């Protein structure tokens, strides 16, 4: 692993990294039970990647190219993700609160002739928390997710041209911080109530970081 700090003494963070893994024998690590800081015998994948990260103030930009080799396979053992680009920016307004935008585009080639290209856009809105006269702490958050993709020779995705999907969810959470005091101790607890609503066609987001 080679890392180059390009943002040293600069008003931003900039890092370029190269990672390479190679072996002359597909079963060498497992046969000899090699475990070091760089190699784990239980890991059957070799990873080679180039990564560039840039961050300044409320904006970040990542570019990555990756190649994977599955040592357990004799054919279709390679997987490529190129490019893999992520851009994100955070906004804040006294009136509307926090707004986080993230966009990611990547192209994947795996199992020989399978291809997927994704463009994902996420918009997360959080106006902040507010306390009612009765002491309830309320929080509202909303997210809009736009997924665009093309797939070829896959069975788990649609392959009929460019697919566009749009989903949204809004969340309301309310809690009541309470304290129980004794002469020698005190305990705090907060009963919490949460409601989520996803208008339109619902799509599983369990693998995504939602709230």
Language model segments and positions:
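Outer-membrane beta-barrel proteins and related beta-barrel translocases across Gram-negative bacteria
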Residues: 1-211
């Amino acid at each position: 692993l080679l890392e180059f700090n390009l943002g040293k003494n600069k008003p931003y963070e900039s890092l370029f990294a190269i990672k390479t893994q190679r072996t002359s024998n597909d079963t060498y690590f497992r046969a000899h039970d090699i475990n070091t800081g760089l190699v784990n015998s239980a890991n059957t994948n070799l990873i080679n990647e180039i990564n560039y990260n840039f961050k300044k103030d409320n904006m970040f930009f990542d570019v990555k190219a990756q190649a994977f080799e599955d040592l357990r396979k004799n054919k279709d053992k390679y997987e490529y993700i190129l490019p893999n680009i992520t851009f994100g920016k955070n906004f804040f307004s006294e009136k509307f609160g926090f707004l986080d935008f993230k966009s990611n585009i990547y192209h994947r080639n795996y199992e020989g002739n399978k291809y997927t290209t994704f463009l994902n856009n996420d918009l997360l809105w959080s106006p902040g928390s507010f306390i009612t006269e009765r002491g309830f702490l309320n929080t509202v958050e909303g997210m809009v997710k736009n997924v665009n993709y093309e797939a070829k020779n896959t069975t788990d995705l649609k392959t009929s041209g460019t697919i566009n999907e749009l989903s949204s969810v809004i969340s309301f959470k309310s809690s009541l911080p309470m304290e129980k005091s004794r002469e020698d101790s005190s305990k705090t607890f907060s009963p919490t109530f949460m409601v989520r609503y996803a208008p339109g066609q619902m799509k599983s987001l369990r693998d995504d970081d939602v709230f």
